[in-house]
């Protein structure tokens, strides 16, 4: 595998797709509150009957996307094996993260205090469908052996 690794490297996370019950409510949260751009809003490739809304950078760069498939009839999910616990957006500094925390709380969004793992700092909120959303500082980060020194 070592010789093939240069040819077969994973370069990062491309996108995360979740399910939402109400696409308009999801747009209000991620575009209007969080400031993400809608980079696509239309039928899903997997299910032409389902609306698929993509949020991210204006140019749609891979690694900057989160999308939601609109399935209003599905029941609410539960956290468990085979489900996703949360997804995280990155900010550069603790000051930027604190500004997000203050802004979100000012908008009536329940937001945790800062949690410092030693590798990065995190705050957590829930979107209208209950997805856990983390806003994390980029550093100091992890190395192969654990948190960076």
Which residues fall in each region the model found?
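Conserved oxyanion/phosphate-binding beta-strand-loop segments in alpha/beta enzyme cores
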Residues: 65-68
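Short beta-strand/turn micro-motifs at beta-sheet edges
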Residues: 2-5, 73-78
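Long, contiguous binding/interaction regions
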Residues: 29, 79, 85, 136, ...
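Core segments of cupin and vicinal oxygen chelate
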Residues: 19-63
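Short, solvent-exposed loop/turn elements at beta->coil junctions and helix N-caps
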Residues: 41-44, 73-74, 115-118, 122
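N-terminal beta-strand motif that seeds the catalytic metal site of vicinal oxygen chelate
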Residues: 1-25, 84-89, 141-149
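Vicinal oxygen chelate
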Residues: 1-8, 13-21, 53, 57, 75-149, ...
